[in-house]
Each structure stands twice: as structure tokens, then as C-alpha cells.
């Protein structure tokens, strides 16, 4: 989101571009260098300065962050081919989760008991819940990069849900 904020600032205040454009480029480059998993075509969930807080037998890199990926796309961090692969993975995750839309926060969810907050159960709230406005960010990103038909297809379950519920709700499980 910082990259998007820098882009917005430089657009609003063109005189700042000389100072901030190189910083933006360095952050984008380092984001790709340290967080992009080329082999799995996804972002690494976290890099810990010390040990992971999770058990040694838990592979956190198997978790796919839908919302973070959408924001990375909006920030211009992914190529069109990577966006296509990302969308395919999101659709695959929706099917695997039995969810309605690409608004999933992440998939698969963290196992029960991994968080101090007891409400962070699998498929609850930010641990695999389906958030229409998260999905909306991906819809916007798809349109931004020319995937208009795909955006139209993926927004349909969101619109259907809003119509069926006679309103827009924060999240679904």
C-alpha cells in the first residue's frame, strides 16, 4: 500500500517525483527480491527477523494471501502473466475452500489455536473469511491491468450475494 501511496503522492505533487521515484523503485525491487516466491508464483506470507512463532512442522509458505496479492497487483509488482497465474490460484482456492468469491483473505487458513485471539478460527474473520471488499480490490486490479472479462466473471458471486442478502455485509464464512 505504501507504493500505491507514493504513486498517488507523486501524481498529486509532481515536484516530489525526483525524490520519491527512486525510493519507490527500490522498495518495489526489494519487495520482489525478498517476498516473491518465483517457484510457487506467490508472495511469501512473512519474513521473521527471528524464529517463526509457529511450530517447526508448519509451512506458512503454503498459505496464499488473496488480499495482499491484490494490493501487490494494484501497486504494479506483478507482470500480466503473474496476474493471470494469481487469479487462477485464487479461483482454485475458492473451490477448495467451498467459498463464494475471490474475496477470501487467505487460503488455506491457519490451524485452530495458532493465534492468541480465540475468534481467529479457520475460515473465521481474517483467517480465511470471504470479504466482498477484499474481492473488490482484486476486481479493480484486474480491470486496471486489462482483465475486464475475468473481473466481470469474478464479481458475479459478490453481486449475487449482496442482492440475496439485501445488503452489503463486511464478511462471510
Ranges and model annotations:
Residues 114-151:
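C-terminal substrate/ligand-recognition segments
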Residues 1-114, 156, 160-173:
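Catalytic cores of carbohydrate-active enzymes
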Amino acid at each position: 500500500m505504501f507504493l500505491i501511496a507514493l504513486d498517488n503522492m507523486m501524481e498529486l505533487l509532481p515536484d516530489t517525483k525526483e525524490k520519491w521515484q527512486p525510493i519507490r523503485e527500490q522498495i518495489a525491487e526489494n519487495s520482489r527480491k525478498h517476498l516473491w516466491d518465483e517457484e510457487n508464483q506467490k508472495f511469501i506470507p512473512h519474513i521473521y527477523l527471528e524464529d517463526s512463532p509457529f511450530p517447526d512442522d508448519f509451512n506458512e509458505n503454503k498459505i496464499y494471501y488473496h488480499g495482499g496479492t491484490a494490493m501487490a497487483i494494484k501497486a504494479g509488482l506483478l507482470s500480466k502473466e503473474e496476474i493471470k497465474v494469481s487469479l487462477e490460484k485464487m479461483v482454485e482456492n475458492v473451490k477448495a475452500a467451498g467459498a463464494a468469491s475471490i474475496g477470501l483473505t487467505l487460503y488455506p487458513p491457519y490451524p485452530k489455536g495458532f493465534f492468541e485471539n480465540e475468534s481467529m478460527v479457520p475460515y473465521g474473520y481474517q483467517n480465511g473469511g470471504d470479504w466482498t471488499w477484499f474481492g473488490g480490490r482484486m476486481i479493480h486490479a484486474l480491470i486496471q491491468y486489462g482483465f475486464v472479462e475475468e473481473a466481470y466473471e469474478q464479481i458475479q458471486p459478490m453481486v449475487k450475494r449482496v442482492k440475496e442478502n439485501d445488503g452489503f455485509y463486511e464478511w462471510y464464512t
